[in-house]
Each structure stands twice: as structure tokens, then as C-alpha cells.
Regions:
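Glycine-rich, proline-tolerant flexible connector loops at the mouths of alpha/beta enzymes
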Residues: 73-75
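Short acidic, Gly/Ser-rich segments with clustered Asp/Glu that frequently serve as metal-coordination loops
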Residues: 34-37
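Short beta-strand segments at enzyme active-site cores
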Residues: 28-29, 63-69, 152
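Short, well-ordered beta-to-alpha junction loops that form the rim of enzyme active sites
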Residues: 69-70, 129
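A short alpha/beta connector and helix-capping loop motif
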Residues: 39-57, 61-66
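Active-site-adjacent betaalpha module
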Residues: 4-8, 17-25, 52-60, 77-203
Length: 203
């Protein structure tokens, strides 16, 4: 059962928790040197949770895929620029795939989209930067493609903006926009438990 209808106000929306479970991949979005720094909301906590999650994924044989954003030549945030590179603290392991996108959603890179389709995965663990831009766009794009999406708490973050500080923006998406409607927002511990369950099924 891919969709189960529930009443939501005056409309009807699908319940994301009723989508089928499948094999997982971790999608690490835009953790690049130019934006992965102490300006982010709860930066140190973000790093701790990310490292724990990535270590558990690798130990569970859950594939980790990185996606980097390219703002174009001359922007200072493009191929060849130091700020474009992945932050050392969250660097990929040898052999892990890295895709480059030019728009907010990871699915704007058609090779990324084709790779997921080829692997026949249907559960994506989406983490990284920024909650209100590329993370949100990727979650909505994945939902439209009928993926089941997991958002581990504290594994995405963002900056202050002209309307909300980083903490409020984080809460707006993680506690209001995404839960139940577009994604399952669960603890890092529960996410790791699910990954370990996948490893047991694969043995």
C-alpha cells in the first residue's frame, strides 16, 4: 500500500508512514567547506550526529552518496574552488559516489536520479545542508517520486535569514513541514536501528 488517505483539515493527504520499506541509501547534501561552519544552527551537534550516522551506515553496508552544489564559474563555489570541496570533518570514504548539481534538488542531476532507479532503492535517508533550501527541495522531489524518506533529527541545519533565525527555520521544517506528510523525522538512534535491521536482512 503506497498511499493511505487521512483527513488533514479540509483536504486529504497521503500518509508517508504507509509507504513500503525497502533498502536504504544515505544522501549527504552540500556539506561543502564554504558553508559547513560555525554560522550554522547547532553546528557542533550537527557534526556529532552526522559522524555517528555515517559511521553506522558504513558499518551496516548502507551506501552513502554525496551531492555537491555548483553555483557556476566565478562564483567562488564551483569546481576548482576550495569552498566547493566537501568539509574535511564529513569527507567521503574512498569509492563513495559524488554527484554535482546546479539546482537545489539532488534530482536535478539526472545521473543521480538514474543511479537510484537502477539500484531499485526506495528508502532515502536525507541529511546535510541547508534545511530550507537543498534539503527541502530534495525531500519534496523524492516524495514526488514515491521514495520513502527518513530525516534523522539534528542531521540537517541552516543559517539565520532575514525572517527567522537558524533554530526557528530548522524547527519549521523538521517539526512542521516534513513530518508524516513528506518524511519520517526520527532520532539518529532509531535511524541507526533501521540500518542495522537492513544489514541483518542482507546476511
Amino acid at each position: 500500500l503506497w498511499y493511505a488517505e487521512i483527513k488533514y483539515g479540509t483536504g486529504v493527504v497521503p500518509r508517508v508512514e504507509d509507504r513500503k520499506w525497502g533498502h536504504m541509501k544515505v544522501i549527504v547534501v552540500d556539506v561543502q567547506k564554504g558553508i559547513t561552519d560555525a554560522r550554522l544552527y547547532n553546528y557542533e551537534g550537527f557534526l556529532v550526529r552526522m559522524k555517528r550516522l555515517l559511521t553506522a551506515a558504513r558499518q551496516s553496508n548502507v551506501e552513502v552518496i554525496y551531492v555537491k552544489h555548483d553555483d557556476g564559474p566565478g562564483s567562488g563555489f564551483s569546481v576548482g574552488d576550495e569552498d566547493f570541496e566537501i568539509a574535511d570533518a564529513l569527507a567521503p570514504m574512498e569509492g563513495e559516489k559524488i554527484f554535482i548539481k546546479e539546482y537545489n534538488s539532488c534530482f536535478s542531476n539526472k545521473k543521480f536520479e538514474a543511479y537510484l532507479e537502477e539500484c531499485e532503492e526506495n528508502t532515502l535517508i536525507v541529511v546535510g545542508l541547508q534545511s530550507d533550501f537543498c534539503i527541502n527541495a530534495t525531500i519534496l522531489s523524492a516524495f514526488d517520486r514515491e521514495y520513502r524518506i527518513i530525516v534523522p533529527k539534528g542531521c540537517n541545519t541552516t543559517f539565520d535569514n532575514d525572517y527567522m533565525d537558524g533554530a526557528t527555520t530548522y524547527r519549521f521544517y523538521n517539526e512542521y513541514v516534513w513530518p508524516d506528510r513528506f518524511a519520517q523525522c526520527i532520532s539518529v538512534e532509531d535511524t541507526i536501528h533501521l540500518m542495522l535491521g537492513q544489514r541483518r536482512l542482507a546476511i
